[in-house]
Amino acid sequence: MGAAPSRIVDNLLDDTNFDRAEIERLKKRFMKLDKDSSGSIDKTEFMSIPGVSANPLAKRIIEVFDEDNSGDVDFQEFITSLSIFSGRGETDAKLRFAFRIYDIDKDGYISNGELFIVLKIMVGTNLEDEQLQQIVDRTIMENDVDGDGKLSFEEFKKAAETTEVIQSLTLQHNI
């Protein structure tokens, strides 16, 4: 391992919840996923991760993992994002990641339209659009403390704390 990769691992030790052995193990998994050896995982490679392709929010998850908006997920982005979901991940970081799934335009708020889009992805054709819109409207109305018609992170966080969202954002598997 050269100086640059060693420095990356050292940075990841400081910035994540993983120890050196876990990072090395995840690096091997990352390299297996990186089928074209480009140093990053594209959408197709990301979808080959077990359980990801079946997740209706897979596209949004990839976009949130991709911090620099390059279209691919590099090793640092991969490890940093996975760290959030480890058992040692902080609740606030887990909720911020979930918030970013909904905040499609990255303006720091979840609008009525964004909430509708993400929930539509999740429920598919199981609900009529009118029913879904009623749920979205009620969700915004019940949680929009400042009355601006959208949810800030703090409003989202308060709403999520009353549900089992935090538990569902923790990986239960040994990495």
UniProtKB/Swiss-Prot annotation:
Keywords tagged on the record: Calcium, Metal-binding, Repeat
Extra remark beyond the main annotation: This protein has four functional calcium-binding sites.
Protein name (Swiss-Prot/TrEMBL): Calcineurin subunit B
Role description: Regulatory subunit of calcineurin, a calcium-dependent, calmodulin stimulated protein phosphatase. Confers calcium sensitivity.
Cell division is among the record's keywords: no
InterPro entries named in the record: EF-hand-dom_pair, EF_Hand_1_Ca_BS, EF_hand_dom
Gene name for this UniProt entry: CNB1
Pfam families xref list: EF-hand_7
